[in-house]
């Protein structure tokens, strides 16, 4: 069965870029153009991974992540924030909100499939909390240097 990735981003070109590159690697891609439809799709389809933009009109990515974590049906789905917000504090917030990785735009779309595969291998091995802890430690170290 193909890995299912839900891309929640209000920018159609970003969703298309993700779709083309992930489908080329044999993954199934679901799309949502805003927070509410992303939540509905996540709850109905239970994807393996969610790529989530932060800056969306209405319900932003931070709130979407909070709602996903509060819902028993979706709280186990790994979230990768995919956003233009590159500040270290934003990255730390994303990980604090349950994200397992944080990719800043612009990004190399060819790197998405290997990222998703690696993430699923680690999460499947029960290392989700380890992945998040590593990211938080790295980000806190960088924040202390500022």
Question: Whereabouts are the PLM-identified features?
Answer:
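Active-site beta3 strand of CheY-like receiver
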Residues: 45-51
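Receiver (REC) domain active-site loop signature in two-component systems and cognate sites
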Residues: 56
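Short hydrophobic/Thr-rich beta-strand motif most characteristic of the beta2 strand and flanking loop
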Residues: 26-33, 41
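Charged docking surfaces used in two-component/phosphorelay signaling
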Residues: 16-24
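CheY-like receiver
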Residues: 123-146
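C-terminal output helix
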Residues: 107-116
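Short, glycine/charged-rich "phosphate-handling" switch motifs in NTP-dependent
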Residues: 100
């Amino acid at each position: 069965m193909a890995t299912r990735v839900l891309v929640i981003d209000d920018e159609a070109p970003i969703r298309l870029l993700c779709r083309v590159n992930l489908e080329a690697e044999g993954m199934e891609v679901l799309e949502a153009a805003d927070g509410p439809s992303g939540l509905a799709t996540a709850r109905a389809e239970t994807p393996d991974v969610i790529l989530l933009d932060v800056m969306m009109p209405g319900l932003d990515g931070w709130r979407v992540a909070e709602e996903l974590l509060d819902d028993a049906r979706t709280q186990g789905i790994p979230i990768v924030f995919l956003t233009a917000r590159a500040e270290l504090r934003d990255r730390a917030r994303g990980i604090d909100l349950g994200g397992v990785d944080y990719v800043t735009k612009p990004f190399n779309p060819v790197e998405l499939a290997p990222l998703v595969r690696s993430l699923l291998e680690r999460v499947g091995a029960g290392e989700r909390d380890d992945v998040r802890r590593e990211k938080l430690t790295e980000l806190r170290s960088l924040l202390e240097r500022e």
